[in-house]
Regions:
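Left-handed beta-helix
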Residues: 2-196
Length: 196
């Protein structure tokens, strides 16, 4: 990683340092908490890093996918919804990637859901970062309960976030607490008493 610590190490070793004055938006997103905050800032009415400025150009070729579909009885507020996403539930104060499906009865709050993920019926997801190609079963509650430090990596999995790694499968009818990280295909047996 390249951060401020690297600058100090180079200075101590007497290595040459160079500086560049930059007046644009910059935010250190080296932790899950700061990454989550940076995404939530994009939802502000006029974000500091304003993606809607006239001088922003599109330099990458986008996927050829249909526009977003928001069902008639769906609710979306203060959120960014990418192309190809289908919303049948509720999305509040969240950033949703391309090709995501949010099924009927699901409620998403203060979360980041990356592309091609599927959120099941009647799921409640609070303050989560969900990576690409994740499948969440029906009736899952995520980000629930008291904020308890993560047992394995309390300095990494903190900030009250639930973190779900790419290609993860979460079975239906489970509850996932705050500061939890899930990776890989899981089954009901991985959730003692239906809770993690």
């Amino acid at each position: 990683s390249r951060g401020l610590g690297d600058v100090y190490k180079r200075q101590e070793k007497g290595q040459r340092l160079f500086a560049y004055e930059y007046n644009g938006y910059w935010k250190d997103v080296g932790t899950l908490g700061s990454y989550w905050e940076a995404n939530m800032e994009l939802i502000d009415i006029i974000p500091e890093f304003n993606l809607y400025e006239e001088f922003w150009k599109i330099y990458t070729k986008g996927d050829i996918i249909p526009p977003q579909y928001i069902a008639a009885d769906a609710v979306v507020d203060r959120s960014i919804i990418s192309e190809g996403t289908e919303v049948y539930g509720e999305v509040h104060n969240s950033v949703i990637g391309a090709g995501v499906t949010i099924k009927k009865g699901a409620v998403i709050r203060d979360s980041i859901i990356m592309k091609q993920s599927v959120i099941g019926e009647n799921d409640v997801i609070d303050k989560a970062i969900i990576a690409e190609n994740v499948t969440v079963g029906d009736n899952v509650v995520m980000g629930t309960g008291e904020e308890v430090p993560n047992k394995l990596k309390p300095n990494v999995y903190s900030f009250g976030l639930v973190t779900v790694g790419e290609n993860t499968v979460i079975p239906p009818n489970v509850k996932i607490g705050k500061n939890t990280a899930i990776v890989g295909e899981t089954t009901s047996e991985d959730y003692p008493g239906g809770v993690l």
